[in-house]
């Protein structure tokens, strides 16, 4: 789903119009480029009528929280950091296909007691063409999506980020929550997520890939790399990395075989896709 090609200033004007029509917003900030850009744009459009909320949990990469805190301090945001409590939700922890529904249900439920403002998310136009059970939770909680309302896609978000001075953050790669690395049906385990995060940082340091994901599947651990990095990986380094990955998991009493594959978006989801009911 593509938005018409427009200049960054035109898209920013459309976004400003949506935000001003809302009046007062509470931005759910994950630490990714979409929500950071929305928060920065809202601060400029609405001044003091904006608050930001960031949730921390074992599924949130520490660097996402640190990035959010740094931008908030620099931009003068009113930021609340909270625990959304999804790790106390059995439905979330059993990791069903619609796990994101339970994650967002907990997130929006945790934000609501702190504000009477309209809660908004960084969902953009491209997201509507993907499997996003979190959008069902957003609808149930009355959350609005200003980028969607302004017909702005991912490319437009990055253009706006550059236009409003977010600098190198405009090129920030996508980095979904750590629970997205665990195959559907394998229970979420905080210690396992720590291992996943540590391994991804290890591979980033050693190989400098454009993209890396450490997936935990029923058949073992899969290190997914962008095609160029995978093609250039010699057998010797692959073997050494395999041993280090296995050792990290074994240190936490997990035993897995390790393989390397080309990066595929959302490959930890099982292949079937069933509709998420409008609970």
Protein language model features and the residues they cover:
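Mid-to-C-terminal catalytic subdomains of enzymes
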Residues: 148-214, 260-262
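A short interface-forming secondary-structure element
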Residues: 218, 222-237
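ATP-dependent adenylation/nucleotidyltransferase module used to activate substrates
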Residues: 2-163, 221, 239-253, 262-278
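Short, conserved beta-strand edge motifs with alternating hydrophobic and charged residues
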Residues: 119-122, 171, 179, 224
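A short, flexible beta-alpha/helix-coil linker loop
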Residues: 87, 183-185, 228-230
